[in-house]
Every structure is written in C-alpha cells, then in structure tokens.
Amino acid sequence: MTKGYWVVTGNIHTPLGMVPYINKFTAWLPTVGARLLIRDLQADVREGTPGSVNIIVEFNSKEKAVAAYESTEYQELINLRLQHSSLSLTSKKSY
C-alpha cells in the first residue's frame, strides 16, 4: 500500500509557546494511525529557505493524511501553534 506523509517545514518563533501544541500533537498522532518519522528543529539547510524546522509524519495512505489534516481535532490543534510558528505543511504520497 502507498503511504501518505505530511512534510512540514518552517520556523518556530517562541519555542516555549509551542509546548502545548507539541504535547497534544504527539498524543494525537497514534489516534489517527500516524507516526512521527523525523523531527529536526535545527535542520542544516544547504539550499533554499525552508526554515530550521523539518518534520515528516507517516500515515497509511495519502487519503488518511488529508483526512487527519481536515479533522476537527487537528484544526483545533493548529490554533495552538499559529502565533508561535510559521510552518508549511504538504501532504504527499510515496512511490
């Protein structure tokens, strides 16, 4: 089966302000069948300007990744991080 992923890049402006989001996000992931593959908060960026945060989350399919993003639970979590970060999130599928 083709896996789905969230690829997240960007910057965190107030690290302590992100703690509630990170705690709830980490607890929420298993409830949607997802797992955190990579969390690098100080990435060594060699090209481009994606920011120092790089996160990859794996889902059982791209459809599940999209459904998780669109879920009420995740939409509520987003509000916990908005004022503390500038992040981009893209849903992708594996080959």
Summary of predicted features, one role per range:
Residues M1-V53, N60-V66, E70, K93-Y95:
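Short S/T/G/P-rich N-terminal loop/turn motif that feeds into the first structured element of a domain
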Residues K62-T90:
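C-terminal structural segments of small proteins and small subunits
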